[in-house]
């Protein structure tokens, strides 16, 4: 039997380094990793978004790469930026109806109300209205629930502010919410504004409801007080928010 060189007797997983007397294990080449194709993630479009954005002011492209960001920060709608639309973290539709979109008794008379500019965002202003002196307070608005996300609990909220000198608020105001098709009794309550913090916008909640596709229609909401005949001053109104309950 012929003698074999010792290197020939080494296991096939070892070799001798020419520069070293030590044996170095040979690493097997790792098999290629098979990468499974990933499914493209899809984000569900907000309810009725395409129809809503037809009234965007300025216009917005549905194919914009920044559409999601724009919807989160808010989009103004026609006419004349009287409505703001945005989408919350749950992908639910939210709306703000500014004072110009509401029916306010005597708001066009400078003896009773005064209009002023309020900053809504770094680049956008909206019109708010301040009460100078009235005894007949009547603010009403309406909204089509077809643009609200079905199955979500929504609340209707007046955005108001009191500034001194303010008077006439010892008498509570009436709040009323009427749902579509008269299926439910109107939600009504009285709220005192006297103790509201001054010089800051606060929420005055009217009521809540769950919009349904089968019962879509128009809601109406109002804040009023004209039975007591008391003169009122110091109230400012920014608008009404219709948003998922917080």
From Swiss-Prot:
Coiled-coil segments: none
InterPro entries: PP2-like, PP2-like/Lectin
GO molecular function list: carbohydrate binding; proteoglycan binding
GO biological process, alphabetically ordered: response to insect
Tissue specificity annotation: Vascular tissues, specifically in phloem companion cell-sieve element complexes.
Pfam family, one: PP2
PANTHER family, A to Z: LECTIN-LIKE (PTHR48478:SF1)
Name by which UniProt lists this protein: Protein PHLOEM PROTEIN 2-LIKE A1
Organism for this UniProt entry: Arabidopsis thaliana (Mouse-ear cress)
Classification lineage: Eukaryota, Viridiplantae, Streptophyta, Embryophyta, Tracheophyta
